[in-house]
Amino acid sequence: EHVYKVDLKIADKLKEFGKLMALGKLRHSYPHSWRSKAPLIFRNTPQWFISMDKNNLRQKALESIDSTKFYPPQGQTRLRSMIETRPDWCVSRQRVWGVPLPLFVYKNNGEPLRDIHVINRIADIYEKEGSDAWFTSDPSRFLGDKYSAEDFDQTSDIVEVWFDSGSTHAFVLEKREDLIWPASMYLEGSDQHRGWFHSSLLESSGTRGRAPYDSVLTHGFVVDG
């Protein structure tokens, strides 16, 4: 049955087991599809996360903030408060376009394959052919002779786009001979304390132990008309 047509049946079951505290109707705003105008259905799905605390990413990011110059100074407080309270970073998305999340998962226990040789092989293929190779190549090409593709599920998730943007310091500053890492300044609007400044800080603090910038300048906005 449709999820919205079984509400009362679910309530009856809860009541039957003595688990229903109250039943009534509330008028409130609710997200609807911009296409069909139908109410959205929320569904929990398995995702991939980067822990903020298991390997001290939060603390590394906070120390990076303290070592960064902010213009104006209140930008430091804004970004710091976000890092202090943010949850683990969900880096997977279910889309038909984007950069694939290159993970193989053991079928027998659901654990990801952790093998630096496989990771390097995937990275080499990505660099030569682009990330679409993940979707077009046979899994055995990435796994090599050591593993059987029959033992793994190949993920079809993509990496969330803010991880993409947060990685630009690596493939721009570290790849071009006319540029140096870290950047002297990142310059953007105040919305990027939650966006580019934020994701760049986490990605770089996790992989390089510091922010990818020496300073951050937050500019204002101009509205035309």
For each predicted feature, which ranges?
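Residue patterns forming the tRNA-binding/recognition surfaces of aminoacyl-tRNA synthetases
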Residues: 1-115
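Conserved active-site neighborhood of enzyme catalytic/cofactor-binding cores
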Residues: 6, 81-82, 86-88, 92-225
